[in-house]
């Protein structure tokens, strides 16, 4: 009996520790414990940090009577491909109609390893969490913690007692600490420039990923409005992205026309945004951008309603 008790006690303790994780100990875990959703934001970390569902929900509540959830991850974790498609399917509620979806795209989210960019078996995400997390709406979620939680479990308790400055919110938005020191910001930007120059040398456009992007668009279009967007970048990082896929906007304009959805590049006539590292918007700019995005969607819906009335 004592042996059984000692065997069960650690599991029970772990169960309750996982229940108190509130988004501060890990940037992705809570995305796999929240319920299935009616509306989603898709993309990588730019979208994860830069688009605030709370602002969209408030600004668009007269148009869409539902809440949108940020289901964006990372450059390597959620490029468009079979794993992201299947995870999105799992995260969607059944029978959704009259919803809306925001799909963020950049050159890197539709690129693959340069040796064979269309070979699914060598896609980087095969070794990351989307490959292992079979259920995306259970709390606690052992599929994620078994393979992809790399910190001590005590970190969960520490963050609960003394919270840090980063947090994954209940709506999927990843809040980060704003770096105000100019030297730190410059250093981070230089690191990003080096990283993405190197990334471009090792990756190229993937027709397979592009086709999966199309498949995701068509999947979501059956459930509501789809808005395809290119998020703003600093001039330095944007120049590198433009080198990755030339005539990117022409490619996306064609896809939007083919699938019957709206596309906008927010780098065109962009207002003055502040980037933590050249890539990710800081909190204040995330607020500004989310409002800009909401206005664009609202204006489109108003124009569409006017045409049909």
Regions inferred by a protein language model and the residue ranges of each:
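Hydrophobic membrane-insertion alpha-helices, especially the h-region
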Residues: 2-19
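Alpha-helical transmembrane signal-anchor/signal-peptide segments
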Residues: 21-39
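Catalytic nucleophile-elbow at a beta strand-turn-alpha helix junction centered on a G-D-S/GDSL motif
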Residues: 37-53, 283
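Membrane-embedded segments
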Residues: 46-138
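Secreted/periplasmic serine-hydrolase-like ester/acetyl group-modifying domain
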Residues: 118-216, 222-223
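Active-site segments of SGNH/GDSL-like serine hydrolases
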Residues: 179, 216-241
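C-terminal regions of proteins
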Residues: 241-309
């Amino acid at each position: 009996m004592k042996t059984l008790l000692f065997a069960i006690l650690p599991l029970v303790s772990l169960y309750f520790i996982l229940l108190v994780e509130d988004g501060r100990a890990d940037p992705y875990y809570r995305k796999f414990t929240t319920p299935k959703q009616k509306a989603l934001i898709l993309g990588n970390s730019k979208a994860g940090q830069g688009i605030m569902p709370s602002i969209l929900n408030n600004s668009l509540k007269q148009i869409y009577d539902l809440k949108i959830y940020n289901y964006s991850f990372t450059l390597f974790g959620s490029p468009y491909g079979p794993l992201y498609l299947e995870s999105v399917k799992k995260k969607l509620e059944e029978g959704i109609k009259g919803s809306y979806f925001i799909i963020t795209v950049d050159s890197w989210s539709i690129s693959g390893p340069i040796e064979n960019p269309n070979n699914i078996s060598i896609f980087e995400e095969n070794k990351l969490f989307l490959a292992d997390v079979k259920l995306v709406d259970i709390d606690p979620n052992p599929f994620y913690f078994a393979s992809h939680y790399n910190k001590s479990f005590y970190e969960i308790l520490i963050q609960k007692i003394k919270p840090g400055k980063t947090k994954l919110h209940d709506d999927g938005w990843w809040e980060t600490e704003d770096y105000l020191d100019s030297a730190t910001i410059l250093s981070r930007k230089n690191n990003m420039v080096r990283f993405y120059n190197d990334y471009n040398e090792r990756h190229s456009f993937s027709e397979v990923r592009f086709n999966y992007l199309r498949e995701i668009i068509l999947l979501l279009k059956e459930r509501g409005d789809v808005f395809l967007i290119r998020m703003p970048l600093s001039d330095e990082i944007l120049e590198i992205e433009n080198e990755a896929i030339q005539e990117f906007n022409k490619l996306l304009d064609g896809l939007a026309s083919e699938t019957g959805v709206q596309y906008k590049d927010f780098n065109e006539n962009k207002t003055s945004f502040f980037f933590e590292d050249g890539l990710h918007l800081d909190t204040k700019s995330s607020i500004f951008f989310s409002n800009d995005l909401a206005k664009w969607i609202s204006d489109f819906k108003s124009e569409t309603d006017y045409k049909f009335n």
